[in-house]
């Protein structure tokens, strides 16, 4: 049996999760997801970018999107040279809790300048990454930092994984030019 002190702690943690799942049931959230899907269906390849915890989620997102038939890859090194030429058929999904990570902003801006559409998934809508994006999906969960040290960000990525899987499922079965690769 769980003690009342332990139960209270669990309930506090679940409040943020519950709030997030209530927000995803809104019409505005559904429209935001559809806007992202519309941008992605115009692309022949999808690039995920992020640093730190977001880079690992980007790798997961790329794998998930490949599983549903969309050619995707993750750039986990922010100093990777950006392709030369035009990127009209490329979509970028930039992941960042703060939306202010310098390396992610730099890479997203380079890709956008090359013609890539830019979808960002951030914790808040009023951040630099969201403002430069063609579409921003924000999730508003409580940020959790170990001892308030920026190097130990323990903010839950559950919302980001849910959003990526939701978009991936929407893309499943939608025809794109990479269908012959799979």
How would you label these PLM feature ranges?
Residues 1-32:
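HTH-adjacent hinge/linker in prokaryotic transcriptional regulators
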Residues 32, 47, 178-179:
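Secondary-structure transition/capping residues
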Residues 174-182:
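A short, charged, Gly/Pro-tolerant segment at domain boundaries
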Residues 7-9, 32-35, 79-80, 137-139:
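Short hydrophobic/aromatic-rich motifs at helix boundaries and adjacent loops
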Residues 7, 25-27, 34, 103, ...:
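Residue-identity detector for glutamine
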Residues 20-24, 39, 170:
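Residues that form generic nucleotide/phosphate-binding pockets
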Residues 41-175:
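Glycine-rich phosphate-binding loops that contact phosphosugars or nucleotide phosphates
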């Amino acid at each position: 049996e769980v003690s009342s002190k332990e139960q209270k702690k669990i309930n506090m943690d679940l409040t943020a999760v519950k709030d997030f799942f209530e927000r995803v049931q809104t019409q505005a959230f559904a429209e935001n997801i559809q806007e992202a899907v519309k941008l992605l269906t115009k692309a022949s390849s999808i690039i995920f970018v992020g640093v730190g915890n977001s880079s690992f989620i980007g790798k997961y997102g790329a794998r998930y999107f490949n599983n549903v038939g969309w050619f995707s890859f993750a750039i986990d090194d922010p100093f990777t040279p950006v392709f030369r030429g035009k990127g009209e058929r490329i979509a970028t999904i930039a992941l960042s809790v703060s939306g202010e990570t310098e390396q992610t902003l730099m890479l997203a801006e380079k890709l956008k300048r090359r013609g890539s559409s830019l979808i960002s998934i951030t914790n808040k809508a009023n951040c630099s990454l969201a403002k430069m994006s063609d579409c921003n999906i924000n999730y508003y969960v409580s940020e959790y930092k170990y001892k308030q040290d920026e190097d130990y960000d323990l903010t839950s990525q559950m919302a980001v994984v849910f959003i990526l899987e939701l978009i991936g499922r929407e893309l499943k079965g939608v025809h794109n030019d990479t269908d012959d690769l799979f």
